[in-house]
């Protein structure tokens, strides 16, 4: 699949923009704070209905405006689709072929993207929240039911946390309601857990050989899910629910005292092992970056295996963060099969066939100038 054109209105520092793209490589060049990352972000937001940079939608709207809009034309193997996302202070509304979608979960996954930005290099050594977000965003693209379960889980979690804070003063009168929320949380949480297990099993199948290739056969990558309760992938759903319920009973008083939910998928984590050593703790910066690169390249292949079309790859100021060898491995892997967007302050130092015949987009203070490099 590829995005053939985009239109922006009141998006970040863009008052109005209409732009067409090449189906292979598009290089967005500009100095810092000119709008190149905003353009890249707009493509991501059009696909995912949320930003990878902020959770505050108001930041996506141009200063002193009430709304922002992103439109795009998506070309798939057997169809051409128009996508539209309208952003206001009240929230977001999505349209697909001019038809408004009742739920964003119906819209997400139509256009698949893989974002690789400098902060993704922190996927290994960053906080558990970074890794959970990685799971949620990537799984949501290929499993709409996951997004539904996640949204329901988060609603119940908010209600349960509010009740726990209320119970800090007097817990006896609210225990029945707490049990109701606990059972609802377990119901949605176990389904989230199962989907994560399934996803990571597939990701492992793709990431391990990719990592082996980048490391020239010297390293074996293993991805391990670390749940906040003592459950495993081999357990059936009823057993997982049973373990969750027992765990919630054992931490009930601590949760009331702390006023928050202490276990569940929102507290889980991922660990990455290279040659049986925890990369987060014992890995070199090179191993951590190889692991992050392996995961991103695995995402591309995993999405293709699930939806039978390659996703759009967004490389936001990340090539300069990779050494020549990893940079070449990345560009060799995607060459000719994935529509790719690259942001950079300069193409100097990036010598690769992939960038030949790329469309070059120069961004200066929210305006663009385009050319196709046929050198």
UniProtKB/Swiss-Prot annotation:
<dbReference type="GO" id="GO:0006260">
    <property type="term" value="P:DNA replication"/>
</dbReference>
<keyword id="KW-0547">Nucleotide-binding</keyword>
<dbReference type="GO" id="GO:0005524">
    <property type="term" value="F:ATP binding"/>
</dbReference>
<keyword id="KW-0067">ATP-binding</keyword>
<dbReference type="Pfam" id="PF02463">
    <property type="entry name" value="SMC_N"/>
</dbReference>
<dbReference type="GO" id="GO:0005737">
    <property type="term" value="C:cytoplasm"/>
</dbReference>
<dbReference type="InterPro" id="IPR018078">
    <property type="entry name" value="DNA-binding_RecF_CS"/>
</dbReference>
<comment type="function">
    <text>The RecF protein is involved in DNA metabolism; it is required for DNA replication and normal SOS inducibility. RecF binds preferentially to single-stranded, linear DNA. It also seems to bind ATP.</text>
</comment>
<dbReference type="GO" id="GO:0000731">
    <property type="term" value="P:DNA synthesis involved in DNA repair"/>
</dbReference>
<keyword id="KW-0227">DNA damage</keyword>
<protein>
    <recommendedName>
        <fullName>DNA replication and repair protein RecF</fullName>
    </recommendedName>
</protein>
<dbReference type="GO" id="GO:0003697">
    <property type="term" value="F:single-stranded DNA binding"/>
</dbReference>
<keyword id="KW-0238">DNA-binding</keyword>
<dbReference type="InterPro" id="IPR042174">
    <property type="entry name" value="RecF_2"/>
</dbReference>
<dbReference type="InterPro" id="IPR027417">
    <property type="entry name" value="P-loop_NTPase"/>
</dbReference>
<dbReference type="GO" id="GO:0006302">
    <property type="term" value="P:double-strand break repair"/>
</dbReference>
<keyword id="KW-0963">Cytoplasm</keyword>
<dbReference type="InterPro" id="IPR003395">
    <property type="entry name" value="RecF/RecN/SMC_N"/>
</dbReference>
<keyword id="KW-0235">DNA replication</keyword>
<feature type="binding site">
    <location>
        <begin position="30"/>
        <end position="37"/>
    </location>
    <ligand>
        <name>ATP</name>
    </ligand>
</feature>
<keyword id="KW-0234">DNA repair</keyword>
<dbReference type="GO" id="GO:0009432">
    <property type="term" value="P:SOS response"/>
</dbReference>
<keyword id="KW-0742">SOS response</keyword>
<dbReference type="InterPro" id="IPR001238">
    <property type="entry name" value="DNA-binding_RecF"/>
</dbReference>
<comment type="similarity">
    <text>Belongs to the RecF family.</text>
</comment>
């Amino acid at each position: 699949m590829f995005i053939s054109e985009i239109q922006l209105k009141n998006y970040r520092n863009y008052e109005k923009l209409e732009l067409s793209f090449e189906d292979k490589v598009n290089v967005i060049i500009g100095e810092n704070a000119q709008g190149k990352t905003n353009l890249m972000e707009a493509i991501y937001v059009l696909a995912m209905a949320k930003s990878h940079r902020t959770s505050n939608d108001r930041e996506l709207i141009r200063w002193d405006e009430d709304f922002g809009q992103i439109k795009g034309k998506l070309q798939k193997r057997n169809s051409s689709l128009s996508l539209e996302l309208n952003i206001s202070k009240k929230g977001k509304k999505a349209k697909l072929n001019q038809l408004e979608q009742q739920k964003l979960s119906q819209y997400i996954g139509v256009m698949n993207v893989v974002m690789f930005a400098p902060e993704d290099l922190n996927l290994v050594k960053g906080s558990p929240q970074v890794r959970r977000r990685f799971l949620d965003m990537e799984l949501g693209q290929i499993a709409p039911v996951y997004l539904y379960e996640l949204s329901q889980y988060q609603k119940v979690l908010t209600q349960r946390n509010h009740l726990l804070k209320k119970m800090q003063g007097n817990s006896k009168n609210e225990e029945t309601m707490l049990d109701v929320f606990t059972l609802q949380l377990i119901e949605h949480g176990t389904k989230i857990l199962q989907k994560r297990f399934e996803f990571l099993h597939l990701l492992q199948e793709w990431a391990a050989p990719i990592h082996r290739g980048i490391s020239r056969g010297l390293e074996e990558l293993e991805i391990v899910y670390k749940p906040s309760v003592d459950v495993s992938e081999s357990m059936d759903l009823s057993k997982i629910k049973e373990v969750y319920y027992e765990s919630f009973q054992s931490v009930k008083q601590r949760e009331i005292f702390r006023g928050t939910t202490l276990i569940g998928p929102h507290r889980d984590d991922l660990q990455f092992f290279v040659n049986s050593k925890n990369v987060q703790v014992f890995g070199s910066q090179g191993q951590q970056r190889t692991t992050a690169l392996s995961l991103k390249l695995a995402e591309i292949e995993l999405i293709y295996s699930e939806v039978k079309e390659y996703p759009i790859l967004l490389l936001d100021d990340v090539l300069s963060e990779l050494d020549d060898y990893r940079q070449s491995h990345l560009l060799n892997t995607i060459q000719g099969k994935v529509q790719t967007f690259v942001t950079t302050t300069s193409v100097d130092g990036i010598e690769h066939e992939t960038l030949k015949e790329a469309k070059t987009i120069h961004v200066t203070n929210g305006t663009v100038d385009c050319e196709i490099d046929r050198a």
